[in-house]
């Protein structure tokens, strides 16, 4: 799925959070959004998945203006892994993942055999097949995050939006989650806190600071020592490994 944003602006009162964000994301491209806290990463993603209405500008999915789509049509096109997922009811893990099938059903429709097969396959993908009967609220933060990813995978959409998806995960599961997402036959837009993960998995990186796009390009183009200092205010050494990947080492000053 292609995504285009045209001069997106978000303001709360007199404070502007995003300034004229215009970009084009190509079908099946993995785009990482980086920047310090308060740079506008989550705000931009919330505009994509319709939690926030931009103060100005337009968003297009495959040429159709996002505001013209029903929420059901949006859910058939895009799944979301948000930063915080609060559940006030005692749902099982399998019930949580089955919620990803909701866009395909009527309000009173029951889950079908295919829905259960898709949900269980998603749990297998994230390594939680043995957890399906567990209460979601009893899981650790990292386990809950993997369940939320499984729910998004069960949605079977053309686009996946993730807001710092590796929060609460140890290194093994960070790599496993990002590898799963990278292998999807889908467009991926993800806010990423860890620049080394962004360097490994992203086709393109968009860097934000104070609500503005600072630069956009391949990891090699964006993740330079100069850009990291400008955006984050820290000194870093950027190494190119023999396989062409980047390794970022931060310096104490």
Positions of the model-derived regions?
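The feature captures the beta-strand-to-loop junction immediately N-terminal to the Walker
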Residues: 34-36
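Conserved ABC transporter NBD signature motif
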Residues: 57-65, 74
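Catalytic Walker B motif of ABC-type/P-loop ATPase nucleotide-binding domains
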Residues: 160-164
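Conserved ABC ATPase signature
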Residues: 110, 135-139, 143
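Conserved structural motif at the start of ABC-family nucleotide-binding domains
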Residues: 3-5, 17-20
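Conserved ABC ATPase "signature" region
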Residues: 98, 113-131
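Helix-to-loop junction immediately C-terminal to a conserved catalytic motif
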Residues: 49
